[in-house]
Amino acid sequence: FKDPRVRLAFSFQSKYLGMSPFRCPSLFTILSFLEYEHGVFHPRGGCGAVSQAMARATEKLGARIHLNEPVEEILFEGRKAVGVRSKSGIRPCDALVVNADFAHAMSHLVPNPLRKRWTDEKLEKKKFSCSTFMMYLGLEGRMDDLAHHTIYLADDYRRNLRDIEDDHVLTAQPSFYVQNPTVTDPGMAPEGMSSLYVLVPVTHQHDNVDWARETKAFRKVVVEQLEKVGIDDLDQRIRYEKILTPALWESEQSIYKGATFNLAHTWGQMLSRRPHNRFEDLESVYLVGGGTHPGSGLPVIFESAKITSQLIEEDARKVKKTTFLPSRSGDAGEVDRAWGSAATMQSSTLGKPASGSLSKTA
């Protein structure tokens, strides 16, 4: 392709990984093929409906899900995880699955001396993705002329990306993505209303940007950008608004540096060079999420969960072949020794139930 606009149309998908299309490994050009060849699907009830469907399926299989119970500490015997401590007490485990943000979980829940490859010092030197400035809006009136997905790229897209990834400053003309799900799924808002999801790529947490001071002004810039795609009188129509900045991603959602796409997908941090699903620094600890293999993005994260569950099953079969289980001591002395228990770190809250059907979107 010679036209730069067409080139961007077939490469901007790298932002799904939080990366610049001018630097992203060419492996990820497959994303544009998948999108244009097979289309994009919307789960009725939103992406949260997928999590809810999974929750119902696991509960039918006997799992118990504990929400609003943050894990305060992972308990170890040597390098082996034997349980977690939460506000309600200690929960023992034979296998621990960490689906919290990887770097945050390591730096807050795992003692630094227990880690070899992923120490605090090494994490600080890793390259992390950009962050996002988010606006979740409930609007008066329908917006049937606005497509389900709208992507606006800044006129000077290279400059926009340089501001984000190199200079770590706020750009005067940001790119953005808007989702208007009610045109496909009317149940995503009350009758006669619309819900909008606005995502603006920005730098991850950096000393150059003080979000306590900049949020109001940057919101104004974003609203002005939204007017360019025909969203007029926005402030007058807003009935609900929630904003998330990189600072809030870090403080409220426990995302390391507010880097919403986790470790950057550079050649040095891809595939086997990411933290392994069977975590290499600890025993009986498994990872899922954007920080492990294969990488970030919801479909890919689901694949990481599939990989991890298969590894747990393989390891459990090996354990069943043994005839002797050693006694536990230290922190493990507080842990109930009942065999077969499991602990899962829950990093998200499930919303109200919704159907799990899919609709193809434009």
Language-model-derived ranges and their functions:
Residues 64-65, 69-86, 240-255, 327-330:
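Beta-rich nucleic-acid/ligand-interaction surfaces
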Residues 1-52:
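Conserved redox-cofactor binding core of oxidoreductases
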Residues 70-76, 313-352, 360:
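Active-site-proximal substrate-binding core of FAD-dependent oxidoreductases
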Residues 290-313:
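A conserved FAD-binding loop/helix module that cradles the flavin
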Residues 140-250:
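C-terminal segments that line or cap access tunnels to active or ligand-binding sites in enzymes
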Residues 72-190, 326-330, 344, 351:
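Mid-domain catalytic core of redox enzymes
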Residues 3-18, 171-179, 232-294:
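A glycine-rich dinucleotide-binding beta-alpha-beta segment and adjacent secondary-structure elements
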